[in-house]
Amino acid sequence: TKPGYINAAFRSSKNNEAYFFINDKYVLLDYAPGSSRDKVLYGPTPVRDGFKSLNQTIFGSYGIDCSFDTENNEAFIFYENFCALIDYAPHSKKDKIILGPKKIADVFPFFEGTVFESGIDAAYRSTRGKEVYLFKGDQYARIDYGSNSMVNKEIKSISSGYPCFRNTIFESGADAAFASHKTNEVYFFKDDHYARVKVTPGGKLAIMDGVREIVDYWPSLKDIVPL
């Protein structure tokens, strides 16, 4: 990620809200899926101030470079080779750490000895069970955080699993991603561009409006990115 651009994002349990992480700060958006009516609800503010439980952690000091939502008000957050499971307690100051911070390989032992052990670039929650897709460079893996296992036990290239990304900037990787509240839609971000992708588990993948510049279609981020 270039400094000042979106490092990580995750979908909130609150409808049409998502958290975006930039440098050591974050912003809470109503991202108004499929429209340009998105607006800032909170921020940009330092992670350590908005999430008091992270104040004395690596995430409070340096920020969050990957994240994905799980159940209820919970999410996994990452920074370099560390991760934690948090209750982010939307619209309250009651956030807490449930697990960690621990090394990625300690929480997800199947990543030991793989490219994901040293850090994860982007991730999004699938609509299938407790599955999540994680990205590192031009590779991706599918995991099940319920059974804590890698699905199919293989790491694949983005170009093979996401043919819609061939010959785009996303073929070589993504900086951030999050699953929309609209079923089977995912947003991917890289530097000053984004793509909205239709993802049908086991089915076809398609970029919905092409790869676009964030500044043209996200009025809420226009004055924030780059931060």
From Swiss-Prot:
UniProt binding sites for Ca(2+): N7, D65, D121, D175
One GO MF term: heme binding
Binding site for spermine: S118
Keywords from the named record: Calcium, Cytoplasm, Metal-binding, Repeat, Seed storage protein, Storage protein
Identification of the protein by name: Albumin-2
Localization terms from the record: Cytoplasm, Cytosol
Hemopexin repeat residue numbers: 3-46, 61-111, 117-165, 171-221
Coiled-coil features, chain-numbered ranges: none
Keyword Calcium among UniProt keywords: yes
Role noted for this protein: May play a role in response to oxidative stress and polyamine biosynthesis. The monomeric form binds one hemin per monomer. In the dimeric form, about half of the dimers bind one molecule of spermine each under physiological conditions. Ligand binding is mutually exclusive as binding of hemin leads to dissociation of the dimer.
Organism per entry: Lathyrus sativus (White vetchling)
Gene3D superfamilies: Hemopexin-like domain
Any single Gene Ontology cellular-component annotation: cytosol
Pfam hit, one: Hemopexin
Principal cellular location given in the protein's record: cytoplasm
Oligomer and partners: Monomer and homodimer. Dimers are prevalent in solution.
